[in-house]
């Protein structure tokens, strides 16, 4: 077989084995154009993204909770004010920023006697005032006849807000105990001289300030005489001698029930002066001290003569007579 014949045979065999694609290609080219089928988009799950956002919210909430908790713990432990309650017992209360008692300290032996049976830590101001007033009443330091309490707050440690809250708490406690309330309340500025005097006299700085205000305005009442008196007697003396308190609020009035009635004392004074009620054209009375004892001093006039008669406020004995 010649080369030409061999090549022709090979071409024939290749054509026979190769599929005829031309007709199919031609048919596709001649057919109308079709829109490609839109591919279906499968959304990716958002679990990962949501899980990340949830974690961030949890973290933020935890930070907020810790901040609030930390602030709350700070407010419960850090002193927010120091106040003293005086009747004759003198009790110092340190309170936190939420108005709860952190500690109670006795400033004199009478106060220690009162505090021995009390647990005031973590109590509210109202509860502490209720318990202190009730204990003072039980122990005889407060009663319907001796009803005055002095509230003193150190300046810069609670100031007027604490003073007002504690004064209101004491007023409420006295009412609950069946007393007519009598509360003196003050904010005390830092005064080194006053603190030295208070320490030497064995009294609170608040009581020392009350004594100073009385002795400064009433010539015949000295600090040495006043220092041993309970708060109720100081309150009586201040009111009777028209003391104008500076920086001190007053609620109610001091009771004089522990002393003889006015009419009884007046009758003793009239008899000692040789007068009758009809003879008197002018009369006045004030409480004062003679030898450290409370007396009722009557100034009487019959139009011709003037008398000053001092009657012991407890025994009704005449202590002094001039005129």
Residues covered by each model-derived region:
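Disordered, charged N-terminal biogenesis/targeting segments of membrane/secreted proteins
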Residues: 1-48
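Extended, compositionally biased low-complexity polar/Lys-Gly-rich tracts
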Residues: 9-16, 53-56, 299
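Alpha-helical structural elements
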Residues: 17, 49-52, 69, 282, ...
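Single-pass transmembrane signal-anchor helices and their membrane-water interface zones
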Residues: 21-33, 54-81
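Short hydrophobic short-linear motifs embedded
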Residues: 39-57, 64-65
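Short, positively charged
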Residues: 44-47, 66-71, 287-295
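Polar, acidic low-complexity tracts enriched in Ser/Thr/Gln/Glu with frequent Gly/Pro and Thr-Pro motifs
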Residues: 74-323
């Amino acid at each position: 077989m010649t080369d030409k014949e061999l090549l022709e045979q090979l071409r024939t065999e290749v054509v026979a084995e190769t599929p005829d694609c031309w007709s199919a290609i031609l048919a596709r080219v001649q057919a109308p154009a079709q829109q490609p089928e839109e591919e279906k988009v499968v959304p990716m799950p958002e679990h990962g993204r949501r899980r990340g956002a949830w974690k961030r919210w949890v973290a933020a909430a935890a930070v907020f909770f810790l901040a609030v908790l930390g602030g709350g713990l700070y407010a419960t432990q850090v002193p927010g004010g120091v106040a003293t309650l005086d009747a004759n017992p003198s009790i110092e209360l340190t309170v936190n920023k939420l108005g709860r008692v952190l500690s109670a300290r006795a400033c004199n032996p009478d106060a220690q006697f009162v505090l021995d049976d009390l647990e005031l830590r973590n109590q509210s101001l109202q509860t502490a005032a209720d318990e202190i007033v009730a204990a003072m009443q039980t122990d005889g330091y407060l009663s319907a006849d001796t009803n005055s309490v002095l509230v003193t707050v150190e300046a810069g440690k609670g100031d007027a807000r604490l003073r007002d809250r504690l004064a209101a708490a004491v007023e409420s406690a006295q009412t609950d105990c069946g007393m007519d309330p009598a509360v003196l309340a003050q904010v005390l500025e830092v005064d080194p001289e006053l603190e030295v005097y208070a320490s030497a006299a064995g009294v609170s700085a608040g009581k020392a300030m009350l004594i100073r205000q009385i002795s400064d305005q009433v010539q015949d009442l000295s600090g040495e005489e006043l220092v041993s008196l309970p708060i109720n007697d100081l309150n009586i003396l201040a009111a009777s001698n028209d003391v104008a308190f500076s920086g001190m609020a007053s609620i109610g009035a001091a009771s004089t029930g522990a002393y003889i009635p006015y009419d009884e004392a007046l009758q003793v004074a009239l008899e000692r002066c040789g007068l009758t009620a009809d003879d008197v054209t002018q009369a006045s009375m004030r409480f004062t001290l003679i030898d450290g004892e409370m007396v009722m001093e009557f100034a009487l006039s019959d139009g011709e003569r003037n008398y000053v008669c001092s009657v012991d406020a407890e025994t009704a004995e005449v202590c002094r007579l001039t005129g």
